[in-house]
Amino acid sequence: MRGIYENFCIIGALLSKQGDTWTIWNTNPEETGYWDPKSDTTTTPSTQYGEVVAVCVGRGLWAKIGWSGLTTNYKWAASDSDAIYNNYHAINIHGNGWQSTNHMFTTHSDILTGTIWEQLKNGKTADYDLYLPSKHELLDIHNNTCDGIHVDEQEKGESGHTFNKNLGKLLSLSTDDYWSSS
């Protein structure tokens, strides 16, 4: 778990259940795009109603998991054993992209060797950065599947997906399983 407390970055990922609407939000609005992993739990803002957040911190993927209507607190899942919850889906990341898994969470020491969007796109190495993608591909994870979202198509009006480039703003998954900004 070395490197957990350095090179923080938010990753646009979803934990979802069919029929529900989840939200990705900036977990620390005072430090746009960043989060302090040393804090174990955080009270859900009243405007968020216990929805789900997934973040990446340094070389490890940490998920803050909360089920809408079940809890008002998110708990850090810092290891495989710490993240086996009967009613949760968790996210696991590999060097070649996102993978959705049932009731399991993993961290990898070999991921995030560069800017996350470059890593997902073609494996280039670069300094760590909160990268606001332009013509890079994001992955929308829902219902245990991964759908590629081509941001350049969205910009040209050729895609049904919508994407808010400012990761510091709220991103929601609407009931039709596409990105929408709130």
Language model regions located:
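An exposed tryptophan-centered "aromatic clamp" motif
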Residues: 101-131, 135-182
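Short, compositionally biased
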Residues: 1-127
